[in-house]
Amino acid sequence: MRINRRSMLLGGLGTALAASPTLAQDITFFRINTGGTAGTYFPIGGLIANAISNPPGSRTCADGGSCGVPGVVATAVASNGSVANVSAIAGGSAQSGFTQSDVAYWAFNASGIYEGRPKVDVLRAIANLYPETFHLVARKGAGIKTIKDLKGKRVSLDEPGSGTLVDARLILAAYGLTEKDMKAEYLKSQQAADKLKDNALDAFFSVSGWPLGAIAELAATTGIDLVPIDGPGAEKLLKQYSFFSADQIPDGAYKGVAGVKTVGVHALWTTSSKQNDELIYKIAVALWNPATRKLLDSGHAKGREIKLDSATQGLGIPLHAGAEKFYKEQGLLK
C-alpha cells in the first residue's frame, strides 16, 4: 500500500504544480503502465516511479532529496499487462510500460501472437528488469523426467492467445515434438494445477517468477517433479530466439522438489522510439543510481533481481537511443 499511496501523492503533486504557471513548464509527466495490482509488475512500477521522480521544488539528490530526474513526475498505473502495455505505448497513451521480452519481440516483428498484425516498430527497451522462469511441472509418478517423456501424456500448454502457449510450442519444436504427440489441453496455470491435483492431467507449462503459489501448493500436497529444459534442445532455442535466456529453478524453491535448469524470458521496461533521447538517458541514469539500488533491494523480492549487469540481456528488441547511450558509457555495450 505504501508504494501505491506514494505514486498517488506524486500524481497529486504533479496536478498541483501544473496549476502554477511559473512551474508548469518545468514538469514532465511520465507514465509507467504495469499490470494487475495483485501481481509483481505493479509494485515494481511503484518503486521505479518513485526512483525516477524529482518534482520541481524538491530537494536535489546532493542535498538528500530524490535522485530522480529533475522535473519528472512518474506514476505507476495498473493495467492488463504486457499486451495492453504494448498497445498503450504504440498509441501514445503511456510513455512506458512493462512487457515480457517474448511479447515485445513478437510485437516488434509481427510474429507469434502478433502474426498478421502491423509491426509495432516504435517499441524500444529501457532495461531488462528481472527473469520470468519457465516451469514444466509433472505429476509425481507420471513417468515424466524429460521433455521427450511428454509423448502420449495429458499436457496443458496454457490458455489460447497467451504468450506461454506460443513459447511452449517453440520449446516442444526445439525437442522435435508438437502438440499432436500428446493429449494437449489449454488451461491457465491454476486450472492446470487443479486438474493435475485431481490426477486428470500429467504435466503443464507455466511462466512466472518462483515460487508460484499454485505450484508450491502442489509440491506440498500432491507431489511434483520439475522437468528440465536443457541440453541440445535448449541450446537450439537460445540460439534461434533472442528473447529466451538460460535460467534455473534452485533446489528448495518448492518444498521437497529438486531444482532444474530451464529457460526464461524477461520482464522488460519498454518505451517508444518517439520519446526524447535525453529524457530516457536521464531516466536510465536515475534507474541505476545507488539510491535506487537501496530502494529496489528493500522494496520487493523481485527488486533485488534488477541489476545493471543484466540490463541489456535477452531484450529481443532494440534499446531506446537514450538508454543505449547510458549503457555504452557504463561499458555494457560497445
Predicted regions and their residues:
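Sec/Tat signal peptide C-region and signal peptidase I cleavage site
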Residues: S20-A24
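An extracytoplasmic/periplasmic, membrane-proximal ligand-sensing/linker region
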Residues: Q191, S208-L226, E278-K334
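Ligand-binding clefts/hinges and TM-proximal coupling segments of bilobed small-molecule sensing domains
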Residues: K153-L170, S242-T312
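Pocket-lining segment of extracytoplasmic ligand-binding domains
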Residues: S101-V103, G112, A142, T178-T270, ...
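Pocket-flanking alpha-helical
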Residues: A62-R117, Q190-K195, L201, W210-A219, ...
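A structural signal for short loop-to-beta-strand junctions that line the ligand-binding cleft
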Residues: G116-L129, G252-K261
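N-terminal secretory signal peptides and thylakoid transit peptides that target proteins
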Residues: M1-T15
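Bilobed "Venus flytrap"/periplasmic-binding protein-like clamshell domains
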Residues: F29-G64, N128, E132-D198, R293, ...
